[in-house]
Regions:
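Structured secondary-structure scaffolds
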Residues: 1-23, 75-79, 86, 129-313
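N-terminal, positively charged nucleic-acid-binding surface of large information/translation enzymes
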Residues: 1-156
Length: 313
């Protein structure tokens, strides 16, 4: 992901474009909170360590970003507060109660039909039943807008098969989105009720506007943006993000989706010991060789198989 985005940013700069390449880490939510507890660390320190690891990786892989943002930063909290208040002023937020099946790793609620044998399809883990008082974003209000926009703008989501997947899912019907958490302490306090934290996938998406100084800074020079993302988070970056942007009367970005890297035909998994260490590979073969191999050998938008033998050859 970072290598692909870096290639695009370098190409655009060479062709005279004014580029703002941002990357970073979304640091909040139940997944981070629990991982920090397991490691015996505070969420702040745990998130900082993870972010330092990504910064080091970017340095080794020669990623030419202009801004590395952590969602724990004050600038991001301020923009998040501003945007939530705007959504509320626009009549797109209301208070209610939510009960649903929740995947901690995805930080997302799912319906039963979206699961496979009761497990999240992305992480292959059982979901938890959560019931709590919540504020909601009126996602259902934007269903017809989303269908119309995505159908009329074939380049809005690429590859085409991902655009069709999202479009078909939207046509099945949208439910309003729970945007607060009562049982999660590690997060940005919700502006309308400080006893709640903001849903991580609401505030994490806002980082794109934070890095370009929305609403008073240079954001008009760079928006709408290109988002290069993994196939596991397309829904959040399209159905949810496009609806928020429509409420804010902002243009939609173009969402470009990459696949996953597999190792000997199996998905990467720390738990199963199926891992690739890009830092070690860069030391062994050089970062330029690794960058070139990944860009050349794996068709963009598709899952690709990695082997060290193929890299050597």
């Amino acid at each position: 992901e970072k290598i692909t985005t870096d290639v695009l940013a370098r190409w655009k700069r060479l062709n005279g474009f004014n580029v703002h390449f941002s990357t970073g880490t979304d640091c909040h939510g139940l997944k981070i909170q629990r991982a920090a507890e397991k490691a015996g660390k505070s969420p702040e320190n745990f998130a900082e360590e993870i972010s330092d690891g990504f910064r080091e990786l970017c340095k080794v892989l020669k990623i030419s970003y202009d801004d590395f943002i952590m969602t724990t930063e004050d600038r991001h909290k301020e923009v998040t507060k501003l945007i939530i208040n705007k959504l509320n002023e626009n009549g797109d937020i209301y208070k209610g109660e939510y009960e649903g099946l929740y995947c901690v790793d995805c930080e997302t609620y799912y319906t039963e039909k979206e699961l496979e044998d009761g497990k999240c399809k992305v992480h292959n883990k059982p979901t938890e039943i959560l019931k709590e008082e919540s504020y909601f974003f009126k996602l259902s209000k934007y269903q017809e807008f989303l269908i119309d926009y995505i159908e009329k703008n074939p380049n809005s989501i690429w590859p085409e098969k991902k655009r069709k997947e999202i479009l078909n899912r939207i046509k099945e019907g949208l439910k309003d989105l729970s945007i607060t958490r009562k049982k999660v302490s590690w997060g940005i306090p919700f502006p309308l009720d400080g006893s709640l934290t903001t849903f991580v996938w609401l505030e994490a998406l806002i980082n794109y506007l934070t890095t370009i100084e929305y609403p008073d800074g240079s954001y008009k020079d760079y928006w709408p943006a290109v988002h290069i993302i993994g196939s596991d988070i397309v829904w959040h970056h399209t159905a949810i993000w496009f609806s928020i942007l429509k409420s804010l009367e902002l243009e939609m970005p173009r969402v470009v989706v990459h696949g996953f890297i597999n190792l000997k035909g199996e998905k990467l998994s720390k738990a199963k010991g199926i891992t690739i260490d890009p830092l070690e590979l860069s030391k062994k073969y050089g970062s330029d060789a690794l960058r070139y191999f990944l860009i050349r050998e794996i068709p963009f938008g598709e899952d690709g198989d990695f082997s060290e033998e193929a890299l050597k050859n």
